[in-house]
């Protein structure tokens, strides 16, 4: 069925735009569009916004309200919002609204400002925001919901857009289309296909990278040996679903948490390349708006890096940017350490910042302030705390429990007074500044690949966006209860005798045989390997292209600078198509992070820019030939021609 613009009274303008994806970013884009509509629409003009998502609008699929209450956000309630505030630098009007905490307080949900809400609770907030946006839409603006997937997008002869839905319905005559999708499925690579085929042939289970909320775990039997490959946020989701999600419970004792099994749990084994779980987030002591204000990453420094990148002399992340990140982190660590020991800070900050990273002068400053070698910051010790040791099975288990207990203890000291967690939280607080530097080809292709994608981004995730402290405490209790074991670094899963034998080369003698292998991670954004029909259609027809930096494909959908127009295979930016969010990862950095109040959230300024550009397209008239903008080509140095660096911390 084809849906086109209906007839309107003579002299009345009726424009149509579409937003594909109605999770947090799509909902934010809709809110921003409604906020700015009166800046663009003439008196009496009409605008219909078509929102396209098979899941309930607002929450979308990831944050849907019909998911297990065992699944938590990893951000405290007071630091989550979908509304602009006075801190947000954007062209559109500021329309303040409640944060998740303020909304939950009004709704009497009993959530404290520093508690971690469930994902379903956040979904309820998002659905409420969507309803409020619809209810308060300005005169002449109406929102039409399409519970469907978008499967293709094409130009009409008059330059407007035609969007085809999975229901067979076609929306034509669209003046603008905004893609605001979240995490999308991928076509499995050869290695994953091989594992799945082996599982099918032997009556095993292989669960590919997925959102745990989307996975049917009911076939896992009590006591069945299961290996979870990955110790990040997805691991903790599976851990919860397979324990308290099956009727087990935790109780508090003087010695910590104790787990009381239901008898329905599988026997879980876990591991990752690093061998240890993401570090617990420090208990929040910063309130809703508190953050580390950059000491080194000033506007002048950021502008300097950008000017170099824009002139074709992009900086090297490891050599030029990383030392500054490290200096910011270490400054906060040492100041908190000195306060913890009752020392006066005096001129410590000025002297420490005046020295070069890892220099003899820096070490002398630490000596002058009485900071011993034992208490000095070590990225090696933090990223690989077991060093080069190998362990027996029993020694590894004992070491792991002690490590987890220490991590929980450090987290309890908070992200202000606890030296370790205060320092690691700096990495989270600096995300906006780093985005300004590295986004849109801010690094060379080689540095983007080896230093950012393959090294710093995983390190940043491991250290600064981990689970709440309670998850680490639960993990300890599950190990003590014999429900869970961590196998060690660099685990290998070998197919043999109709099952998988899993072991770590660094814990000799510890081998387990499992019948279910769970890839405990989300699929990485990859335009070339996406299973999303809409993006696949655009790629196959040359209407979009993968983002590249000096020949290195980052995996993201290529877009321009703000307002993020989609670029086709010929390097032309489409005037009526825009994209924000996870599919653009690579062009932008850490796109999965949500909006936070009071800190000029880039998510909100991005959706504002896209919304206003879409409105501009809606009122610009319908030309027979759509104008497209040629995008500047960057110097193309093939990554294959450059020697790969081995990067350590």
UniProtKB/Swiss-Prot annotation:
Molecular-function annotations in GO: monooxygenase activity
InterPro entries for this protein: FAD/NAD-bd_sf, HpyO/CreE_NAD-binding, L-asp_N-monooxygenase_NS-form
Cofactors named for this entry: FAD
Catalysed reaction equations from the record: L-aspartate + 3 NADPH + 3 O2 + 2 H(+) = 2-nitrobutanedioate + 3 NADP(+) + 4 H2O
Pathway the protein takes part in: Mycotoxin biosynthesis
A Pfam family hit: NAD_binding_9
Protein EC: 1.14.13.248
UniProt keywords, alphabetically: Monooxygenase, NADP, Oxidoreductase
Inactivation phenotype: Completely abolishes the production of 3-nitropropanoic acid.
PANTHER family: BLR0577 PROTEIN
Family: Belongs to the nitrosuccinic acid synthase family.
Summary of the function given for this chain in its UniProt record: Nitrosuccinic acid synthase; part of the gene cluster that mediates the biosynthesis of the deadly neurotoxic nitroalkane 3-nitropropanoic acid (3-NPA) that acts as an antimetabolite of succinate and irreversibly inhibits succinate dehydrogenase and disrupts mitochondrial oxidative phosphorylation. NpaA catalyzes the iterative oxidation of L-aspartic acid to nitrosuccinic acid (2-nitrobutanedioate). Alternative amino acid substrates such as L-glutamate and D-aspartate are not accepted by npaA as a substrate, showing the strict substrate specificity toward L-aspartate.
Listed name of the protein: Nitrosuccinic acid synthase npaA
